[in-house]
């Protein structure tokens, strides 16, 4: 089980704990952050804490979406990581950061580290990224991280673009 994820020059990745609930709530109730996710934000800090407690991905699959922390301060600035999507039988890269960290290359730095982790540590052969067509910034992060367009799908009735990166053999 990989509770600790990759490290980069500026970032560490690890499983979120209940101590992160306030920041996790703030992230997932921010309308700018949630605009392109297709998710419903948290209504309370307790709901965020419950989501942290109830996350079975690390136990079930050995990996998940890690909290993403600045190395310099230890501050939770978002999350990034891998999630197995059983309905697609694919592993998806997802990330979400506070707006004050947008435009600094952090999402790309984190995405590249997570993809490398997927291929080296988990020995996956491909990873997908699902993104709403209007989320141009996220599409750019995926492209900078080596992903290529791989069609459109409609999980849960919502049209999304699928991007894919494959391991170099």
Model-derived segments and spans:
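Conserved GNAT-fold acetyl-CoA-binding loop/helix
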Residues: 32-54
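A short hydrophobic/aromatic micro-motif that marks alpha-helical segments and, especially, helix-coil
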Residues: 44-46, 59, 161
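A short helix-loop-beta-strand connector motif used in the catalytic cores of GNAT acetyltransferases and
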Residues: 55-67
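Acyl-donor (CoA/ACP) binding surface of acyl/acetyltransferases
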Residues: 1-36, 69-169
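A generic secondary-structure signal
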Residues: 54-55, 117
């Amino acid at each position: 089980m990989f509770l600790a994820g990759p490290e980069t020059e500026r970032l560490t990745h690890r499983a979120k704990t209940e101590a992160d609930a306030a920041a996790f709530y703030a992230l997932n109730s921010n309308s700018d952050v949630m605009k392109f996710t297709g998710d419903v934000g948290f209504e309370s800090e307790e709901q965020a804490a419950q989501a942290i407690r109830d996350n079975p991905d690390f136990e079930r699959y050995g990996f998940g979406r890690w909290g993403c922390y600045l190395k310099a301060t230890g501050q939770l600035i978002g999350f990034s990581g891998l999630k197995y999507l059983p309905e697609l039988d694919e592993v998806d890269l997802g990330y979400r950061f506070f707006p004050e960290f947008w435009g600094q290359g952090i999402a790309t730095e984190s995405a590249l580290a997570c993809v490398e982790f997927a291929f080296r540590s988990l020995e996956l052969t491909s990873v997908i990224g699902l993104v709403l067509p209007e989320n141009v910034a996220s599409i750019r992060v995926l492209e900078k991280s080596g992903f290529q367009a791989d069609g459109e799908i409609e999980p849960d009735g919502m049209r999304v673009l699928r991007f894919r990166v494959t391991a170099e053999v």
